[in-house]
From Swiss-Prot:
Glycosylation site residues: N233, N460, N502
Source taxonomy: Eukaryota, Viridiplantae, Streptophyta, Embryophyta, Tracheophyta
CDD domains with a match to the protein in the record: O-FucT_plant
The organism of origin for this protein: Arabidopsis thaliana
InterPro entries referenced in this protein's UniProt entry, alphabetically: FucosylTrfase_pln, GDP-Fuc_O-FucTrfase
GO biological process, one term: fucose metabolic process
Designated name of the protein: O-fucosyltransferase 35
Length: 652
C-alpha cells in the first residue's frame, strides 16, 4: 500500500513499501533544466506538481518559482561546469575564485528575479498561495483525526461487545439452563425469560409463574396493552391455620346436593356446599350435577372434575364419600331448599337441627346459598380452597385445554380471551336486540316466552342497553379493542358459542382477523369426546381464558365472574371490565358524528384506566343480590395485603 506526503519544497514524495527493501523507498522528484529554456516546462502539468500550494493561475511566475526551488549544483569536474568551460589555460586558484564570484553573482541575480516576481504579483495572490497551502495541510490533519476517532470507536465497540457477551455467557453457564432462542435466569419462585426472538417481537422481559394452576402451561406477561396491573403487596392467603383443630371422625349427618345451572354456577354452588358441610360438621356425598338446565348436558361430576383429587385436597376440612353408607341407603332424605345469601347463623340454628334429626338431607339448590360478606375468615378461605385447588378439571379437559393454550401462544406471543356473550339464549334472557333485525328481535321474544322460569317477558331492550344491562355487540367489542389500541394482529380466543344475528360477527372479524375458538384450534378427533357436552367444552374455554394475558368479558355472567375471580387470585392478571353504560353512550356519539375517533379513543382509555383487574376491596351492599360476587373478587377473604417486611420475606 503506497503512502505519500509533501516534502518541504512542496513536491509530493512517494514512499513505496516493498519486500525487497528494508525501509521505504522515496521516488525521485521531477527535475528541471537550467539555462535559457528554464522559462517553460516540458509539460504543462508540471505547474501543479512543482509548486507548493500554487493554483496555476500564472504560469510564468510559477515557472520562476520552480527554477528557484530546484536549481541543481553540478560537480566542479562536470563537463557542463562553467569552471571547465571558462578557464582552460588560467591559474587554477584564480579560476576557482573567479568561479566562486560568478556563482555568487548568479545567485544574487536569481534572488533579485524572484523578489521582483513576487513584488509584481498581486498581494492577494501571494496570500492566497500561502492560505491554500495551510488549508490543504489543515484538511489533511482533519481527515487523519476523523480516521483516528472512527478507529477508536470501532475498537471500543468490539471490546465492549466482547465483554458484555462474555458476561451474559457466564451468567447463563452459572445457571446451567439452555434452551433454543430463550435464556432462563432463575430468581426466587419465578423464572425470568429474556426473549430474543424474531423480527416481529421486541426483546421483552417475560415472567413465567411456576406455580400457576398446577401443571398448566406457563403464563407469560408482556408490556404495553398486554401488561398486568400492579398487584402491590397482595398475595394469596388460603392455607389452613396450623393451630386449627384436626377433623374428628364424628359427623352430624350426610348432605346430598344437586348442583344446578351451568358449569360455573355449579362450581360456585359446590364451593358453598363444602363450606356449609364444614359449618354443620356434616359429611358431604360426592355432588350430583344438574342435567335439566338449558344446555341439557348429562356429564357427571367425575366427567367434569378430578373427583379423587377433590376428596384428597379437602380431607382435612370435611368428610367426603362417593355414596351413602349401605346402612343409610334405604333412608328417605329430608328435602330442604336453603335460603339464598344466608350466613353462618342460619345454617347452625335452622338447618343443623334438621340434619341431626333426619341424618340424611337433600339440598335442592346450591347456587348463592351463602352470603358474599360478613362470614368468618375460615369459611371464606375454605370456599377458595375448594374453587382454586380442589375443583380441578378431569384429565381429558385439562390435557386438551393446555394443548389449546400452547396453540394460542404461537411463537410464545400473547393472546386475549374474549368472553363474547352474544348468544341467542343470553340475548333472549336480557331482551337485548340492538343492531338486530325486527325478525331476529321477534324470535328472541318468542324464546323468552317459551322458557317458563324466565320471569321477565316484555323488556325494553333500548333502555336496558343505555343502563349497561346488555352484552356488547361484536361491533361494539371491536370498537372497544381498537380504542384501547390492541393491534389488529392480536390473537383472540373466543370464549363463547355461536354469535346470534346474520353477519353480526363481520365487524369484529374484519378488524381482528386472528380469532380462534376450541372448534378451530382442535381437530375433530380431539373434540369427539366432548361432543354434546357443553359443560366439558366450557371447561376447555375456562382453562384457555384463565391462562390468557388479557381477559375481556362483555357481560357479567357466571363465566365472567368465575374467570375474573380466579385471575385475581393468580396475582391479578389483566382483566378488562367494560363500563358498558358509559361506553355505549360514547359509541352512539361516535356513530352520530358528535365526537371524532381521536376523542372517542381518548375517552374510552380514560374510562377503563382502572378497570383492568387491579386489587380493590369487595364491599358489602344494601342488598346481597346487588353486591359484587365473592367469586368475582375474593379480596378480602382469600387475598391479603402483606406488610413491607412480609413482602420482602416472600420475595426472598
Amino acid at each position: 500500500m503506497g503512502h505519500h506526503h509533501d516534502g518541504g519544497d512542496g513536491v509530493p514524495q512517494h514512499h513505496v513499501n516493498s519486500p525487497r527493501f528494508s525501509g521505504p523507498m522515496t521516488r525521485r522528484a521531477q527535475s528541471f533544466k537550467r539555462g535559457g529554456s528554464a522559462g517553460s516546462s516540458s509539460n504543462n502539468n508540471n505547474t501543479h506538481v512543482g509548486v507548493s500550494g500554487g493554483d496555476g493561475n500564472n504560469n510564468n511566475n510559477t515557472s520562476s518559482t520552480l527554477r528557484v526551488h530546484h536549481e541543481i549544483d553540478l560537480p566542479l569536474n562536470s563537463p557542463r561546469s562553467e569552471i571547465v568551460s571558462g578557464s582552460s589555460g588560467s591559474d587554477p586558484s584564480g579560476g576557482f575564485d573567479s568561479a566562486l564570484n560568478r556563482k555568487h553573482q548568479t545567485y544574487g541575480q536569481l534572488r533579485e528575479r524572484v523578489v521582483k516576481g513576487l513584488l509584481r504579483k498581486p498581494m492577494g495572490s501571494v496570500v492566497s498561495d500561502f492560505s491554500l497551502r495551510e488549508r490543504k495541510k489543515l484538511g489533511h490533519w482533519m481527515f487523519f483525526a476523523f480516521c483516528g476517532v472512527c478507529l477508536f470507536l470501532g475498537v471500543f465497540k468490539i471490546c465492549a461487545t466482547g465483554w458484555l457477551g462474555s458476561a451474559i455467557d457466564g451468567a447463563a453457564s452459572d445457571q446451567d439452563l439452555s434452551i433454543p432462542r430463550v435464556n432462563l435466569l432463575d430468581h426466587s419462585s419465578h423464572d425470568y425469560i429474556y426473549k430474543d426472538g424474531g423480527n416481529d417481537v421486541d426483546p421483552t422481559l417475560v415472567m413465567v409463574a411456576s406455580d400457576v394452576v398446577g401443571d398448566q402451561n406457563s403464563v407469560v406477561e408482556f408490556s404495553g396493552v398486554w401488561a398486568k396491573p400492579e398487584s402491590g403487596n397482595f398475595s394469596r392467603c388460603i392455607d389452613s391455620s396450623r393451630s386449627r383443630k384436626k377433623l374428628g371422625a364424628n359427623t352430624n349427618g350426610y348432605l346430598l346436593i344437586n348442583a344446578n345451572g351451568g358449569l360455573n354456577q355449579m362450581r360456585f354452588g359446590i364451593c358453598d356446599m363444602v363450606a356449609v358441610a364444614k359449618i354443620m360438621k356434616a359429611t358431604l356425598v360426592l355432588p350430583s350435577l344438574d342435567h335439566s338446565s338449558y344446555w341439557a348436558d348429562d356429564s357427571g361430576f367425575k366427567d367434569l372434575f378430578d373427583w379423587q383429587h377433590f376428596i384428597e385436597e379437602l380431607k382435612d376440612d370435611i368428610h367426603i364419600v362417593e355414596m351413602l353408607p349401605s346402612e343409610l341407603a334405604g333412608i328417605e332424605p329430608f328435602v330442604k331448599t336453603p335460603i339464598s345469601w344466608s350466613k353462618v347463623g342460619y345454617y347452625k340454628k335452622e338447618v343443623l337441627p334438621l340434619l341431626k334429626q333426619h341424618i340424611v338431607m337433600y339440598l335442592t339448590h346450591t347456587d348463592s346459598r351463602l352470603a358474599n360478606n360478613d362470614l368468618p375468615d375460615s369459611v371464606q378461605k375454605l370456599r377458595c380452597r375448594v374453587n382454586y385447588r380442589a375443583l380441578k378439571y378431569s384429565a381429558p379437559i385439562e390435557e386438551l385445554g393446555n394443548v389449546l393454550v400452547s396453540r394460542m401462544r404461537q411463537d410464545r406471543g400473547p393472546y386475549l380471551a374474549l368472553h363474547l356473550r352474544y348468544e341467542k339464549d343470553m340475548l333472549a334472557f336480557t331482551g337485548c336486540s340492538h343492531s338486530l333485525t325486527a325478525e331476529e328481535d321477534e324470535e328472541l321474544r318468542q324464546m323468552r316466552y317459551e322458557v317458563s322460569h324466565w320471569k321477565e317477558k316484555e323488556i325494553n331492550g333500548t333502555e336496558r342497553r343505555l343502563q349497561g344491562g346488555c352484552p356488547l355487540t361484536p361491533r361494539e367489542t371491536s370498537l372497544l379493542l381498537r380504542a384501547l389500541e390492541f393491534p389488529s394482529s392480536s390473537r383472540i380466543y373466543l370464549v363463547a358459542g355461536e354469535a346470534y344475528g346474520n353477519g353480526s360477527m363481520d365487524p369484529l372479524n374484519t378488524d381482528f382477523p386472528n380469532i380462534f375458538s376450541h372448534s378451530i384450534l382442535a381437530t375433530k378427533e380431539e373434540l369427539s369426546p366432548f361432543n354434546n357436552h357443553q359443560n366439558m367444552l366450557a371447561g376447555l374455554d375456562y382453562i384457555v381464558a384463565l391462562q390468557s394475558e388479557v381477559f375481556l368479558y362483555t357481560y357479567d355472567g357466571n363465566m365472567a365472574k368465575a374467570v375474573q375471580g380466579h385471575r385475581r387470585f393468580e396475582d391479578f392478571k389483566k382483566t378488562i371490565n367494560p363500563d358498558k353504560m358509559n361506553f355505549v353512550k360514547l359509541v352512539d356519539a361516535l356513530d352520530e358524528g358528535r365526537i371524532s375517533w381521536k376523542k372517542f379513543s381518548s375517552k374510552v382509555k380514560k374510562l377503563h384506566k382502572d378497570r383492568n383487574g387491579a386489587p380493590y376491596n369487595r364491599e358489602s351492599g344494601e342488598f346481597p343480590k346487588l353486591e359484587e360476587s365473592f367469586y368475582a373478587n375474593p379480596l378480602p377473604g382469600c387475598i391479603c395485603e402483606n406488610t413491607e417486611e412480609e413482602g420482602l420475606m416472600r420475595r426472598t
